[in-house]
Amino acid sequence: MKTVLIHGKDDLRIEEVPTPEPGPGQVRLKMAYAGICGSDLHYYFEGANGAFVVREPLCPGHEVSGTVDADPSGRLVPGTPVTVHPATFGECLPGLEGHRHLWPRGAYLGSASTWPHTQGGMSEYLIVEAGMVRPLPEGLSLADAALAEPLAVGLHGIAVAGGVAGKRVLVSGSGPIGLLAAAGALASGAAEVTCTDVLPGPLERARALGVQHTLRVGADELPAESYDVVLECSGVPAAINACIAAVRRAGVIAQIGMTSAGPKPVDLATL
């Protein structure tokens, strides 16, 4: 089968590798779509995603969809359209029974965080644990289903923030994650949603989603102490500082965007 492999910084190759066979408890998927996450770009342009350095050829891709190709258990019918929960979980620690995503030694598709690396879905076929497979509801296309994982990021941020129903919500950074978080906030009953970005294009897309207000960073003023919930999706220190000033007293900031490695100048005095 053909697969995309990142060998290091600026070194991406399409190679032929043996088609894998599913073992007990596994399913083989025929891939249809794979989104390109920011982490995938870091692996390509930098040879690393933060502290996770590419040490062997890495197939990226965790925002995926496809169809069932082979299920040795017979539970899933070949051709069934699916997406994938891209994580497997490590060992539970006391007090973390209900928080599997915090368990140490977990793994993630298309990640150099483990050794050997956990290969991702930018290939013709992918082997996953059966429990990672999510059959699609009727009417959801494979193309749209590839957005399930980034949508889940935004929805998780909303859940961590305690929900947004009836609340004034600020989304900082209107890239794909920010826009999906905004869509999730609208669908979850937010009273109003405001999106910010440094570029006009993302703000146009936010308005197309139904967002009530958009603010251009550097051109429009962000009102102070005005939002019940802030979903910070950029990871930019200046934006984090702006969000601290914008959230109301006793409001909530959910930090969804990832910062780059190293200390960051975030002013906590306002809190």
Question: Model regions: which residues?
Answer:
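Glycine-rich phosphate-binding loop and adjacent beta-alpha segment
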Residues: 237-271
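A short acidic, Gly/Pro-enriched loop at the edge of an enzyme's catalytic core
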Residues: 25, 222-230
